[in-house]
Amino acid sequence: MKQAVIVDCIRTPMGRSKAGVFRNVRAETLSAELMKGLLLRNPQLDPNLIEDVIWGCVQQTLEQGFNIARNASLLAGIPKTAGAVTVNRLCGSSMDAIHQAARAIMTGMGDTFIIGGVEHMGHVPMSHGVDFHPGLANKVAKASGMMGLTAEMLGKLHGITREQQDAFAVRSHQRAYAATVEGRFAKEIYGIEGHDANGALIKVLQDEVIRPETTMESLAALRPVFDPVNGTVTAGTSSALSDGASAMLIMEESKARALGLPIRARIRSMAVAGCDAAIMGYGPVPATQKALARAGITVADLDVIELNEAFAAQSLPCVKDLGLADVVDDKINLNGGAIALGHPLGCSGARISTTLINLMEDKDATLGLATMCIGLGQGIATVFERV
């Protein structure tokens, strides 16, 4: 079977969704700039070789509608002979884009793909136009479409305390801030033009969402936001609202080598899995178990792990049931996660994979896992191997 490899991976800085640096920048522009960036960074690649552009996006309406993958690829100047498709697996959309490209390569249906994802949550809110079928309440718990309440449920089932959630959130901000100050995000962030607080045009080079001042005391002062009476999940222990995009150049290994392109990682295995929609945040557990089995490895073989931090109350049960509680500080989200950086829905799968690959390089690691939960009860996971 042919091998799918990551040649390059980049992301935008994460902009705050409310009056942030990308308030005047459209989702198509964020996407197109990354597509152009991949080509500029890899001049050996003839753009005419691109088979398809596969782009994740959840709210496919307004500026993100009418196949944003094609709109962005045309804006980027990618040859019109390349295809383009927008995919939606909710939070796992751009990781699904990775999987779609990998499967195509493995089965001989192309050897060069640009993949990624975007979500401008400031321009297109998560709930915009959503209208659940009334009959869905006969199949799943009524609150299954309310992500915060599913996190509350999962946290309660696993005995996750408010203090544990707050500590996990503080860790996320501290690590993301340290990664910024120490330049550990520099290789993955591709600068994008935006606007400062005064409206001046600037080149944005750092994430805007991180709050280094976050402490246990400041989080303790926040009130539960989803279940005000009995809940423990606050805005501070939930993924931040942010705007951003991520992108990868994925190729068939021998083709990349023939062109003299770098091989940053190989896709070792992939998996998706379902779980009860009422505890959708548990999805990484069965998805990871599948991916590890397909790779022929165990969780102990993993050197670095990126687990998307939708909520602290969701992440901690996954850490526990995957047998990772004792290695959190050694292996998991070493540069912080979505609580600090935000979770632009369609962007996050390729974003955490990009962060993972850079961490693997920094630590000279061999095996890494990127995994995330998905609304309405799914999980998705990818095992990467440096070669």
Curated annotation (Swiss-Prot):
GO terms for molecular function: acetyl-CoA C-acyltransferase activity. The keyword Cytoplasm applies. It catalyses: an acyl-CoA + acetyl-CoA = a 3-oxoacyl-CoA + CoA. Transmembrane segments: none annotated. GO terms for cellular component: cytoplasm. PANTHER family: 3-KETOACYL-COA THIOLASE FADA, 3-KETOACYL-COA THIOLASE, PEROXISOMAL. Belongs to the thiolase-like superfamily. Thiolase family. Heterotetramer of two alpha chains (FadB) and two beta chains (FadA). This is 3-ketoacyl-CoA thiolase. It comes from Shewanella baltica (strain OS155 / ATCC BAA-1091).
